[in-house]
């Protein structure tokens, strides 16, 4: 069974569409745990959606990693999936994702992410350094880190919008580092997986749709959170590279 964790921050309409996709395309063998990080406005009766959902409601807002770690403790599946509420599906991605996790040393797998027009999104990247971050800030557009072809490959890290882990692996690395409230918790987690000898995998044979919101580019609060997470990550590396 696959336990799917979805954290909603007033993403009720998006989450309902995703749940409908899961009901349409994923034929059994899934458990869905949805966390209301803040109360939905207007309120959503999750018992009326087309697929069974276990709902967790926070008394106060928590970070991305904390929400998914909490859902993991409530989950029962052999595999644990972190899934953003604004992702859409057009087919069942899980057979290909689980097939990729059967490879030796696979610690996490992600599908290829495309936007609603079919353009490939940069959801797999090399680990950031101060130099690469400055280059990205000063040069636009920056070429993608990886050329996407048809075959699965092993990037440095994959984005947290859609990740699938073997349960034992997620438990071994103790999940997300909850000191990252938002942003870079996925980078940090993939770095810790690699240090333990696991591979990060992306398979273009599975696809999901995500239209990037880029809140950190528009909102000062999100930008400040992004900057704090970047600094935490760069300063926490055991052998930091410039």
Predicted region positions:
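Acidic donor-binding segment of Leloir-type glycosyltransferases
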Residues: 19-60
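Conserved donor NDP-sugar-binding/catalytic core segment of glycosyltransferases
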Residues: 91-122
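Active-site-adjacent helix/loop segment of glycosyltransferases
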Residues: 5, 191-242
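A short, conserved alpha-helix in the catalytic core of glycosyltransferases
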Residues: 156-207
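Glycine-rich, basic loop-to-helix element that forms the pyrophosphate-binding segment
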Residues: 58-75
């Amino acid at each position: 069974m696959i336990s799917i964790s979805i954290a909603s921050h007033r993403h009720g309409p998006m989450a309902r569409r995703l749940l409908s996709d899961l009901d349409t395309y994923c034929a059994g063998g899934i458990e869905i745990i949805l966390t209301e990080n803040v109360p939905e406005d207007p309120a959503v009766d999750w018992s009326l959606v087309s697929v069974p959902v276990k709902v967790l409601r926070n008394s106060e807002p928590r970070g991305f990693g904390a929400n998914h770690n909490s859902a993991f403790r409530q989950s029962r599946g052999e595999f644990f999936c972190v899934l953003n509420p604004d992702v859409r599906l057009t087919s069942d991605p899980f057979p290909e994702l689980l097939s990729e996790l059967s490879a030796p040393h696979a610690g996490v797998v992600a599908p290829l992410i495309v936007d609603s027009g079919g353009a490939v999104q940069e959801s797999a990247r090399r680990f950031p350094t101060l130099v690469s971050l400055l280059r990205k800030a000063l040069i636009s557009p920056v070429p993608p880190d990886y050329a996407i072809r048809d075959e699965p490959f092993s990037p440095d890290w994959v984005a947290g919008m859609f990740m699938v882990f073997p349960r034992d692996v997620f438990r071994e690395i103790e999940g997300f580092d909850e000191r990252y409230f938002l942003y870079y918790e996925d980078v940090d987690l993939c770095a810790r997986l690699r240090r333990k000898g696991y591979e990060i995998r992306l398979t273009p044979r599975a696809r999901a749709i995500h239209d990037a919101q880029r809140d950190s580019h528009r909102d000062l609060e999100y930008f400040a959170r992004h900057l704090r997470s970047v600094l935490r990550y760069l300063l926490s590396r055991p052998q930091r590279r410039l």
